[in-house]
Amino acid sequence: MPVPSPYLIDMSNLLEIKDRVIVLMGSTSGLGRALATGLAGEGAIVIPSGRREVQLSALCHEIDPAGNRTLCRTSDVRNRESIDALRDAVLDKFGRIDVLVNAAGVTFKQATVSMSEDQWLALMDTDLTGVLRACQSFYEPLKQSGRGRIINIASLGSFRAFYQVAAYAASKTAVLSLTRSLGCEWARDGICVNAIVPGVFPTDLNIKLIVGTPRGDEMLMRTPMGRFGKPEEIVGAAILLASDGARFITGQTIVVDGGYLASGVNQ
């Protein structure tokens, strides 16, 4: 006779995300794209989105050529109406939304003393206010889901100073603060809000800054694993945070960095 399990949930399905409806903001390239394909590979219904229609169409076709388990619709996190239209289209097709991933981001490298206010505000509009817009827009369907999840993508710049990217670092630090605040504020609405901090992952956003540069070489030296991250290596953390395995985790940050933040002297 089987021994009764002491757990109140089925532990065999703890990390199951099959058929969860996941919307990814900013997923036409880089880590967002890797998250889209990785989560779809685990059986989730994945709706990637972004501003670049050609790249988005190719990604949707890769996820599901028939289009039954995805939706191809551009959106812009700088525009609330665009976000709302995406939300409504997803609800019309699938009837619910379980997970929101905020991966949209821009950056630039410039001495802070010469950075214009317009440059600062433009970056904040995407990297910080865009996250807020999406969270507000998707709040109600995530609440109705009963297992709503928000996963915000932050940065090592939230913890370490990087030369001449002050606006980006400030925006991502604010994203972590927003994550903690919403994690507490929306906990009793059944929405868990967490963040992932990627380590050094070459993407379209940063490749010119870190590949074959003194900055990149220093980052590798400070990473105990001695290499850059691979896009697919961020997917595991997202699977956890999107699953029932994270139903008592909120307002927290998972760092996926090959040991960078824990590092002291590596040689």
Named regions from a protein language model:
Residues S155:
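Residue(s) in the substrate-gating loop at a strand-loop-helix junction
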